[in-house]
Swiss-Prot record:
UniProt record similarity statement: Belongs to the glycosyltransferase group 1 family. MshA subfamily.
Role summary: Catalyzes the transfer of a N-acetyl-glucosamine moiety to 1D-myo-inositol 3-phosphate to produce 1D-myo-inositol 2-acetamido-2-deoxy-glucopyranoside 3-phosphate in the mycothiol biosynthesis pathway.
Catalysed reaction equations from the record: 1D-myo-inositol 3-phosphate + UDP-N-acetyl-alpha-D-glucosamine = 1D-myo-inositol 2-acetamido-2-deoxy-alpha-D-glucopyranoside 3-phosphate + UDP + H(+)
Binding positions for Mg(2+) per the UniProt entry: Y315, R316, A318, T342
Disulfide bonds: none
Taxonomic source organism: Thermomonospora curvata (strain ATCC 19995 / DSM 43183 / JCM 3096 / KCTC 9072 / NBRC 15933 / NCIMB 10081 / Henssen B9)
Binding site for 1D-myo-inositol 3-phosphate: H14, D25, A26, G27, G28, M29, N30, K83, Y116, T140, R160
Designated name of the protein: D-inositol 3-phosphate glycosyltransferase
InterPro entries: Glyco_trans_1 (IPR001296), Glyco_trans_4-like_N (IPR028098), Glycosyltransferase_grp1 (IPR050194), Mycothiol_biosynthesis_MshA (IPR017814)
Keyword annotations from UniProtKB, A to Z: Glycosyltransferase, Magnesium, Metal-binding, Transferase
Gene field: mshA
Assembly notes: Homodimer.
Enzyme Commission number(s): 2.4.1.250
GO molecular function: acetylglucosaminyltransferase activity; D-inositol-3-phosphate glycosyltransferase activity; magnesium ion binding
GO biological process: mycothiol biosynthetic process
Length: 431
């Protein structure tokens, strides 16, 4: 019988839970770490989140909520350091984490949970020093990303592949967002199936919900707040602007829609809510140039990343949220949109096949041909009753994705990891 888990060290080297999602390297992983930590703390589990300090102005320790502390570790230059360069700073980061733990009595942490391969390298060392279970979440995997690269995207380096293979072999448990990710861990990385736990991410259903229980009425209110026309056909993209997310597919689809029906120009609005992460046309200025070349610059509205309450208003205002990513380990944007009552049109890749129920809460499209997206989006415009059915189905589906259920399952994974370590220490195989 495992002893209760009282304190967890969470490691997120390359992105801080305090960063605004949608900027730089901050995205769904940030939301995941914050939501899990808050809910663990509410259940009496203390969480220390170690992340790299990116400014000398940051305090050594910042309280996120009661029971959750963010610990900033100085390792390398504070600014102008790309994620691809962080592997060279892992020794300094690991040293900082080990020093922080050494300031406490032995056994201060009951478990390590690392996020992304860089953090896994740190956890791999700390696990040996502390004698505690290591649970690791990949969030994305190099072999999967390299098999589905977007045009203009850069392949993940060999050092990342090696790092992921090392943490796969060294972790006591691996957390997969979906059954497909679990299969990829086993088939591509040789993970032990018995050490892979599927934990579906959640949505904050108290925040992401139809306003006052209304679907169309809630959309009207949101559009007034955002200064959007009531009669617009609003297509929404949310996320970091990078090749992987393929926002250009939406712009090209919108151009095809207007070309096929010039009268649509009076009503079509494409909103892109997100910040730069990458280069070329995947940056806002690159997308703006593309919109001009396509002749739809007047239809596209670019908005910076925004706090979650405002983001929920964008979801409510939209007719459809479009997620044309080349790969997603889950697809938090799709889940949030559905929770607000807005159906999703998404690429049938990765975790999006779990996050969206095709034909019930949205539409999944094979491939990334803008013509296919234009056809689906045009049909949804022309069939408002179908949109309404999908909107209702989206809300129903999202209700199965609350964060509390995620934490319930994650605690089961933590317990399994502790049982494995305890059994190994006792010289017996875990049951």
């Amino acid at each position: 019988m495992s002893l209760p888990i009282a304190r967890i060290a969470t490691i997120s080297v390359h992105t801080s839970p305090l960063d605004q999602p949608g900027t730089g390297d901050a995205g769904g992983m940030n939301v995941y770490i914050v939501e899990i930590a808050k809910r663990l703390a509410a259940r009496g589990v203390e969480v220390d989140i170690f992340t790299r300090a990116t400014s000398r102005e940051l305090p050594p320790v910042a309280e996120l909520v009661s029971g959750v502390q963010v610990r900033h570790v100085v390792s390398g230059p504070f600014e102008e350091l790309d994620k691809t360069e962080l592997a060279g700073e892992l020794c300094a980061f690991t040293s900082g984490v080990l020093r922080a733990e050494a300031a406490h009595d032995p056994g201060h942490y009951d478990l390590l949970h690392t996020h992304y391969w860089l953090s896994g390298q740190v956890g791999w060392v700390a696990k040996q020093r502390w004698g505690v279970p290591l649970v690791h979440s990949m969030h994305t995997m190099a072999k999967v990303k390299n098999a589905a690269l977007a045009e203009g995207d850069t392949p993940e380096p060999a050092i990342r592949v090696l790092g992921e293979e090392q943490v796969t072999a060294g972790a006591d448990r691996l957390v997969a967002n979906t059954a497909e990710e679990a299969r990829q861990l086993v088939e591509l990385y040789g993970a032990d199936p018995d050490r892979v736990g599927v934990v579906t991410p959640g949505v904050d259903l108290s925040l992401f919900r139809p306003r006052n229980g209304l679907l169309r009425g809630g959309a009207d209110q949101a559009r007034r707040r955002l200064g959007l026309p009531r009669d617009a056909y609003l297509l929404l993209f949310v996320g970091r602007i990078q090749p992987l997310k393929a926002p250009d597919v939406l712009l090209r689809a919108a151009a095809l829609m207007v070309e096929a029906d010039p009268a649509l120009r009076e009503h079509l609005v494409v909103a892109v809510v997100g910040g730069p992460s990458g280069s070329g046309r995947a940056r806002p200025e690159g997308l703006q140039k593309l919109a001009t070349e396509l002749g739809i610059a007047d239809l596209v509205r670019f908005e910076p990343p925004c706090p979650q309450p405002l983001l929920a208003e964008w979801y409510r205002a939209a007719d459809v949220t479009v997620v044309p990513s080349h790969n997603e380990s889950f697809g938090l944007v799709a889940a949030e949109s559905q929770a607000c009552g807005t159906p999703v049109v998404a690429a049938a890749v990765g975790g999006l096949r779990t996050a969206v129920r095709d034909g019930e809460s949205g539409v999944l499209i094979d491939g990334h041909d803008p013509a296919d997206y234009a056809a689906v989006l045009t049909r949804l415009r022309d069939e408002p009753r179908r949109r309404e059915r999908l909107a209702a189905g989206a809300v129903r589906h999202a209700r199965t994705l609350g964060w509390d259920a995620t934490v319930d399952r994650l605690l089961e994974v933590y317990t399994g990891a502790k049982d494995t370590v305890n059994a190994t220490a006792a010289g017996v195989l875990p049951r």
